[in-house]
């Protein structure tokens, strides 16, 4: 027992600075003025609507929609809407292969109906980089056809992505 104590005293704690990543490397910032880019250019099949229900053709029912459902052909490239870190990659029966991306400041982008992802959980993706490709639609979107499910959240609650996207000439749902 004495030898252990002596050894502990013989090796004082070193007072060395701890190296940490710079703020720019570790903290993401979502610029609400700059907004986001369209992850896929295509017709809006289903618009964001959390205030009133909209008709979902495949389901043959009216529901609120926390996302944009953007038409795309199978194998179309899906681009990162903003710089962010891949938080999670999951598979579910509604949106298929789904990617959650932390954009910073409480904002999260969710991309669904994907395949052949180019990134893994923990990777940082720059705006405009290809995240993956449009997949065959799940059974929940079979009538709508192949598409990208694109949701934007602030602190875990859906917000309208169109409030942060530039207008497109093909945007027919305004």
State what each model feature region is.
Residues 1-56, 61-64:
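Polar/charged, compositionally biased leader and regulatory segments
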Residues 40-44, 72-86, 112, 125-128:
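Generic structural motif
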Residues 44, 67-68, 76, 107-108, ...:
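Folded interaction domains in cell-surface recognition and envelope-stress signaling
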Residues 47-73, 92-105, 140-144, 157-158:
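Gly/Ser-enriched beta-turn/beta-hairpin loop segments
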């Amino acid at each position: 027992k004495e030898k252990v104590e002596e050894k502990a005293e013989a090796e004082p704690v070193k007072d060395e600075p701890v190296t940490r990543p710079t703020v720019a490397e570790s903290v993401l910032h979502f610029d609400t003025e700059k907004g986001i880019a369209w992850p896929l250019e295509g017709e809006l099949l289903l618009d964001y609507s959390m205030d009133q229900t909209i008709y979902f053709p495949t389901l043959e029912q009216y529901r609120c929609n926390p996302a944009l459902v953007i038409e795309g052909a199978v194998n179309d490239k899906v681009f990162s809407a903003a710089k962010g870190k891949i938080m999670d990659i999951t598979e579910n029966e509604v949106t298929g292969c789904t990617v959650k991306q932390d954009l910073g400041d409480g904002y999260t982008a969710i991309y669904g109906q994907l395949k052949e992802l180019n990134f893994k959980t923990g990777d940082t993706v720059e705006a405009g980089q290809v995240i993956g490709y449009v997949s065959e639609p799940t059974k929940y979107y079979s009538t709508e056809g192949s598409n990208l499910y694109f949701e934007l959240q602030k602190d875990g609650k859906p917000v309208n992505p169109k409030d942060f996207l530039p207008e497109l000439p093909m945007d027919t749902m305004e």
